[in-house]
């Protein structure tokens, strides 16, 4: 049955479950604007999702659209998409936790030019190792539509060059929503 505390009359889309299973990121479209919300598991029930990440230039949620958020493995960063990025196309951003008790997140930052292109980026998945990001993009050296790429973070916190995962992962069509097991031996698309 529907989880009434999460389902509303608006468009509600789950993005990412925290690695401890206690928090869920959702994006909602209200008044033609998409924003990231978070719900917490209280015992066995999900609390009402709240936009606790702000609504200003110094927050995750801005006057642009923010969607498809997911946690990093340490649950101290979230990665999400915004249409306020380079050339007003969808770009990957991240934000770090500033105050966990009050659920205050820092200003969104671009994942950088090695990841974001002048074309649209899509879904993002952080591998459990915390150093590997899989994402979809229409840019870089896409085979057609969105392809799945991988990038690795260096010791300074910068993402390295995007690498196309190639065939059989990518096709001439849109390839999105990659995830894998912790071992990396099994992937889901």
Regions found by a protein language model. Name each.
Residues 1-189:
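Short, conserved micro-motifs composed of acidic
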């Amino acid at each position: 049955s529907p989880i009434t505390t999460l389902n509303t009359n608006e468009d509600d889309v789950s993005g990412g479950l925290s690695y401890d299973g206690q928090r869920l990121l959702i994006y909602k479209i209200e008044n033609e604007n998409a924003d990231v919300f978070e719900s917490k598991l209280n015992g066995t029930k999900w609390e009402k999702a709240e936009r606790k990440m702000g609504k200003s230039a110094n927050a995750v949620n801005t006057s642009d659209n923010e969607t498809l958020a997911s946690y990093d493995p340490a649950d101290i960063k979230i990665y999400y998409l915004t249409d306020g990025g380079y050339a007003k196309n969808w770009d990957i951003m991240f934000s770090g936790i500033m105050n966990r008790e009050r659920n205050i997140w820092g200003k969104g930052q671009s994942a950088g030019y090695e990841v974001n292109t002048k074309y649209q980026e899509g879904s993002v998945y952080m591998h459990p190792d915390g150093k590997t990001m899989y994402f979809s993009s229409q840019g870089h050296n896409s085979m057609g539509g969105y392809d799945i790429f991988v990038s690795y973070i260096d010791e300074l916190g910068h993402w390295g060059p995007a690498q196309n995962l190639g065939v059989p992962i990518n096709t001439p069509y849109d390839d999105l929503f990659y995830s894998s097991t912790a071992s990396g031996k099994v992937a889901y698309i």
